[in-house]
């Protein structure tokens, strides 16, 4: 007999077990069993824990092996750590939704120094009392200023998308270097 050990790598099978073992005769086919893991998307069975060698269930059994489940977070959000308003007039927010809930990315109004009309406060680095406002806008922000910048509903396939926040030139700016922070909130529900 040949044996195939399937390690759920932190996930579990229907029987709440973390491992499944199948025994087959050479030439028979292994059965693919899919485990589940809270907050994660199953991304396949691999022959190694670095997930470089994906297992092919369409091939007949020839040797005993151990397979490892690869897990990916249900969602990924990419936001640049910083941008320079000297070169950029927009900030791109990217997202991938692999799960069954809706992913939304918006501004965290409690943590961001921003006006009701979505103008970001920029402070002069030499004298923080000298400030200016940089107007922000994104799709739908004119009618609903608190609207999420990016929303990805769950789909039958993995959904990917991006959205752009426009950043206008600061108003009433004086000479000097200015800095400001945007804090985003990510919801997955």
Descriptions of predicted regions:
Residues 73-125, 147-189:
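N-terminal small/polar-rich segments of proteins
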Residues 46, 111-112, 136-138:
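Assembly/interface hotspot detector across virion components, adhesins/toxins, and nucleic-acid enzymes
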Residues 11, 40, 75-77, 120, ...:
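Short glycine-aromatic motifs
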Residues 4, 27-31, 59-65, 85, ...:
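Compositionally biased regions
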Residues 2-4, 23, 45, 57, ...:
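Intrinsic-disorder/low-complexity peptide segments enriched for small residues
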Residues 9, 17, 28, 32-33, ...:
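Intrinsic disorder/low-complexity segments
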Residues 1-73:
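Secondary-structure capping and domain/repeat boundary segments
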Residues 13-22, 29-30, 50-54, 126-159:
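Extracellular beta-sheet repeat scaffolds used for adhesion and glycan interaction
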């Amino acid at each position: 007999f040949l044996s195939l050990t399937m390690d759920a790598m932190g996930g579990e099978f229907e029987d709440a077990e973390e491992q499944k073992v199948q025994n087959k005769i050479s030439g028979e086919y292994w059965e693919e069993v899919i485990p589940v893991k809270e907050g994660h998307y199953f991304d396949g069975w691999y022959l190694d824990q670095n997930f470089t060698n994906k297992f092919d269930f369409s091939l007949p059994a020839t040797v005993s092996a151990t397979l490892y489940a690869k897990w990916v977070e249900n969602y990924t959000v990419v936001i640049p750590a910083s941008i320079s308003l000297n070169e950029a007039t927009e900030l791109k927010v990217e997202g991938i939704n692999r799960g069954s809930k809706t992913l939304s990315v918006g501004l965290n109004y409690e943590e961001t120094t921003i006006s009701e009309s979505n103008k970001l406060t920029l402070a002069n680095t030499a004298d923080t009392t000298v400030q200016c406002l940089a107007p922000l806008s994104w799709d739908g922000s004119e009618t609903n200023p608190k609207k999420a910048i990016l929303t990805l509903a769950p789909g039958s396939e993995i959904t990917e998308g991006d959205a752009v926040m426009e950043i206008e030139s600061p108003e009433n700016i004086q000479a000097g270097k200015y800095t400001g922070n945007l804090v985003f909130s990510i919801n997955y529900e």
